[in-house]
Design a protein with these regions (language model features):
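Bacterial N-terminal signal peptides that target proteins for export
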Residues: 1-5
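Non-catalytic accessory regions flanking glycosidase/transglycosidase catalytic cores in CAZymes
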Residues: 6-9, 15-60, 71-80, 107, ...
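Extracellular glycoside hydrolase catalytic/binding regions
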Residues: 20-21, 35, 42, 138-141, ...
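Conserved beta-strand positions in the central sheet of alpha/beta enzyme cores
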Residues: 39, 60-62, 109, 157, ...
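Aromatic-lined substrate-binding rim segments of carbohydrate-active enzymes
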Residues: 46-117, 135, 174-188, 292-305
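Short, solvent-exposed turn/loop segments enriched in Gly/Ser/Thr/Pro and often Arg
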Residues: 64-67, 113-117, 159, 197-199, ...
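Extracytoplasmic/secreted cell-surface and envelope-processing proteins
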Residues: 71-74, 117-124, 165-167, 203-205, ...
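Active-site-adjacent "subsite" loops/lids of carbohydrate-active enzymes
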Residues: 120-142
Length: 357
């Protein structure tokens, strides 16, 4: 059985000096160019969706997977039901999404968007319950087995925004991902596996990389989400910011391109220290936020400069994130009204960075 080591390994060189741990990548993965794209709602798998994304310049999509709809209601907290949903969902992925993605030259990141067992207790049930922990690992064994050898799979994204509060009873957010990654490697030795930082603030914020540890397996990517400054990107979206009105840039607050670099500095340091590849699974600012087009442009340009893979949040999901919509009235998630648009400042900003600018 393959095991996974989280702590820093000290290799010994021929001279006897300790060498720092470095992430290992197979030559084909090490040679990969940067990919750019968007989060794809699991409801959005039509030919027009992939064609549009390709026209925009996307080369990857982050494909959400979680039980939704009347048929699968409540199955997140039922192992048999979750397993049945996963079998069905993998059929949809292989039979519909992957063929369309291949047709349009787009690769898929397979995203476990909601953890089996749901959230609660220490943050995720599987962190406190060994049955759910084992089940989560078994789910990834199933996914790797069903998708092994399928052309067009860019990576396996183990958990979306893993939440943990306090000390779990079974394993922590990183240990459970380590176990799943090792299980995948027993089946598939090379497809990259994406490990996420802890979702302790701002939906997997860059600051969480201060506590991230590298994993001693080949082809591991490390993920954060970029919703910073959080009170700007989520103003009047979350109850915490129900009265917030903020603009970007804001020199007085240090909210500008250089400020964004300071925010992601922990990730940059991790990348340099361990030679790690970075995946930015989501970034966005709500459509009614003043200056959000400039924020998209600055974040995208920074990610392109650093060569980090990224997916914008989101494509054809909620209009507040969609660049195919504009706000016609209102200034909050509760009051905003939207109209479709095929040309607006936010769209132009995203299309520019999708093309590498």
């Amino acid at each position: 059985m393959m095991t996974c080591v989280l702590f820093l390994l000290a290799a010994v060189s021929a001279a006897g000096a300790a060498e720092p741990f470095k992430a290992q990548y197979t030559p084909d993965v090490a040679a990969r160019p940067q990919v750019r794209g968007a989060m794809l709602s699991q409801y959005t798998v039509g030919d027009d969706d992939f064609r549009t994304l390709k026209e925009w310049g996307a080369t990857v999509v982050r494909y959400q997977m979680y039980p939704v709809g009347e048929r699968w209601k409540g199955k997140t907290s039922d192992t048999d039901g979750f397993a049945a949903w996963l079998d069905w969902k993998l059929g949809v992925l292989k039979g519909e999404a992957l063929p369309l993605a291949r047709t349009h030259g787009i690769q898929l990141v397979v995203d476990m968007h909601v953890p089996p067992g749901g959230r609660g207790g220490s943050g995720m049930k599987m962190l406190d319950d060994p049955v759910w922990a084992d089940f989560f690992v078994d789910c990834w064994r199933k996914i790797a087995t069903r998708l092994r050898g399928e052309r067009g799979i860019y990576a396996y994204d183990l958990i979306n925004e893993p939440t943990q509060f306090g000390k779990p009873k079974v394993c922590d957010y990183l240990e459970i991902q380590c176990r799943a990654a090792a299980a995948i490697r027993e089946i598939d030795g090379t497809t990259p596996v994406i490990v996420s930082c802890r979702n302790d603030v701002a939906w997997c914020a860059p600051s969480a990389f201060r506590w991230m540890k590298p994993i001693d397996l080949v082809n591991i990517y490390y993920q954060f989400h970029m919703y910073e400054p959080f009170d700007y990107t989520h103003q009047k979206v979350l109850p915490l910011f129900k009265d917030t009105v903020a603009a970007y840039p804001d020199a007085a607050k240090g909210w500008d391109a250089e400020g964004l670099r300071r925010i992601v500095a922990p990730v940059r340091e991790f990348e340099r220290r361990y030679g790690a590849r970075i995946f930015v699974g989501e970034f966005s600012a709500v459509a009614y936020a003043k200056g959000c087009d400039k924020w998209i442009a600055d974040v995208g340009a920074m990610l392109n400069e650093y060569g980090w893979d990224w997916c914008y949040h989101a494509f054809r999901e909620w209009p507040g994130w969609s660049v195919e919509h504009v706000v016609t009235e209102g200034d909050s998630a509760a009051t905003a009204k939207f109209a479709t648009s095929n040309d607006n400042p936010r769209m132009r900003a995203l299309l520019s960075v999708l093309k590498g600018n």
